[in-house]
């Protein structure tokens, strides 16, 4: 309700009431952050407290990641990022489409947030004898390696604070971690200050598609 009122008040002509418009804009941004925080808290609570649904599908990874790349290009238009996608069109993984969508989009959105102008973001998917892997790499701010073990904790903020510099709920990587756990997978983080970061999702061989099944994507 509050968000609706604020959006209505924002229709006031800025030239007429500049100070009011500025204050309402700030209030609207705060309401959006609160809305995002509540959404992420509810999602994380569900991931932590419920068992994975037995109904799983063969998710079309290329289609999902290509859509996210297009969204990222739109979001980062003013930063002129180079966003590369290296994903085989036949790539599929058995899982929960909505959960995987949340995990992958969190990683790509983070890369957009923490990569400076004209930076490069690389999204790559590959398979080997160990399973399937998705990496999202950037040449952005980077993180001091001593913080890496705690990055998937709720609300954890490194000293150089990628989060405080760019906003965010502080729950994104916790969500990624729990989605991967529900898919028998894991998250690997490599980073160095000033050199960027690489976040890699690892899925075991049993998550690869080996026979016909329902497809989502």
Give residue ranges: language-model regions.
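Short helix-loop "hinge" at the ATP-lid/N-box region of the Bergerat-fold HATPase_c
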Residues: 111-112
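Short alpha-helical segment of the dimerization/phosphotransfer core of two-component systems
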Residues: 26-34
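Short acidic helix/loop segment immediately C-terminal to the autophosphorylated histidine
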Residues: 10-17
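Short beta-strand/loop element within the Bergerat-fold HATPase_c
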Residues: 118-130
